């Protein structure tokens, strides 16, 4: 199954009703998303061996919230949606969508917001980014989108990605239209931008019991049925791992067919779980999965692979 975004004026009345039954896509609702992430990161930092880094990530998330409202984005994406729909491509495809200078404005605002909170190596990193040329910043952005992580140091990547993520999330929140699920290409990548998931979540409320993958870039969530590998769509050899017990709110879903795993979070076990924060706070589970021979099929926006990984 794949997910395609249909312009609003091309949806018939029956399709509109169907699209409202099980939403294939949940576009980002940006109000307080970064503050909630920052709060969860600070909460999870207590008694966590990674506490210092979780608090560092919380500072970036809080800065994203501030910059989001300081630099709103106005953009008409109607033509872009129709063009992408005709081409069968994600409307905000990271591999083809031209970037304007808005994202660099966001980056410099993030740096200004974070400088008073940083010291030592972290301060040196953002000061280095502050001095980088527009061309150098674009090269780093292109490398990250191409998964060329060896070309961008792992200490710079979270700051670059934080600005790109803000930009793409702002655009995704402005998309006009509905989404429709249809048979086609596998959907292990975000249908809006083509980036990777950070984790998946079994939700409560109006989407009770449904699993959605959460994009690590544009914050969109897309529906993938449970008990199916989100990477290869097989269901023959799935296993669920946790560091606690069967009632754990954070588990890893491994697939013996493709040899990968993805975290799955359960809101019914803990309503406060957050896609990015809880994934980052459970790196001990990642270490266990690596010991078992599984490769991660996702990337956390605060933890990028280094050279040689």
UniProtKB/Swiss-Prot annotation:
Matching InterPro entries: FdhE-like_sf, FdhE_C, FdhE_central, FdhE_N, Formate_DH_accessory
Segments passing through the bilayer: none
Matches recorded under Gene3D superfamilies: FdhE-like domain
Subcellular location field: Cytoplasm
Gene Ontology, cellular component aspect: cytosol
Keyword Cytoplasm: yes
Paired cysteines (S-S): none
Assigned keywords, A-Z: Cytoplasm
Chief place of localization: cytoplasm
Pfam family, one: FdhE_C
Molecular-function GO terms, alphabetical: ferric iron binding
Entry's Gene Ontology BP terms: protein maturation
Superkingdom in the source lineage: Bacteria
Alphabetical list of PANTHER family matching this protein: PROTEIN FDHE
Function: Necessary for formate dehydrogenase activity.
Protein family per UniProt: Belongs to the FdhE family.
Protein name: Protein FdhE
Organism: Salmonella paratyphi A (strain AKU_12601)
